[in-house]
Amino acid sequence: MNAPMQPVAHNPAGNKYVEETRFGFWFLQSHVWQHHVLRVAINDLKGLLGQPLPEGAVLLDAGCGQGKSFRLLQNAFAPAQLMGLDADPHSLTMSRAEAEREGLPVQLLSSDCASIQLGDASVDVIFCHQTFHHLVEQEAALAEFWRVLKPGGWLLFAESTQFYIDTWVIRWLFRHPMHVQRTAEEYLQMLRDQGFEFGPQNVSYPYLWWSRSSDFGLLERWKLVKPKAVGQRNETLVNAAVRKPL
């Protein structure tokens, strides 16, 4: 087997996160990412939230990457102000170009998630999609989310679990800090430990074809095996809409 793909550039945030490989950076521009991963997650999180944003809402995309989420977030939630945060300068350059292409006035922040350059209680909603499995300081990042969220604010959290990240195909094509990967329940417990509130109606466990690297769901599609229910399988993804109490 070949060695893992090499990272695309120097990591300006030091050891706080593990950046994408060249393949990963390309993949974040792909149709599969935009339509089968990002769009699906945003639609699911909107359902888990189950209510419109408050008037004049500020929405922060924490780990915005190349900005492919901006139009989807604007259409789904209609925030009054949309912000994007990323620690990678090249990604921010692409995010800026994407915002201009979409005609969206997105405020961009050059920062990692563990040290957000925003004031306390300044954001109504944080969207954090497929970012935490790159972060080394996960608890510190979550504490920053808590700090910048207003009381009653929401964190829309979508992550891949260790049962997806720790597979041969992902290890080959991508690069992650393996020692901090978590199960779905461990991610949810981390959110609880920070103080976020949520119920079963705010959580989903998507079992999407691309997250099952053993067969990519083909055996189920060909009806060679029966799909397993939640609780009978190793969850590969977890989505949650969690609230900072008033």
Describe each model-derived feature in a short phrase.
Residues 23-27, 102, 200-246:
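A C-terminal cap/extension of S-adenosyl-L-methionine-dependent methyltransferases
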Residues 114-125:
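A short acidic, Gly/Pro-enriched loop at the edge of an enzyme's catalytic core
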Residues 1-53, 72:
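Conserved class I S-adenosyl-L-methionine
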Residues 66-114:
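Class I SAM-dependent methyltransferase SAM/SAH-binding core
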Residues 153-159:
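Conserved beta-strand signature within the Rossmann-like core of class I S-adenosyl-L-methionine
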Residues 180-195:
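Short alpha-helix
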Residues 161-177:
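Short, glycine-/aromatic-enriched active-site segment of Class I SAM-dependent methyltransferases
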Residues 139-151:
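A short glycine-rich, Lys/Arg-flanked "PGG" loop and its adjoining helix->strand segment in the class I
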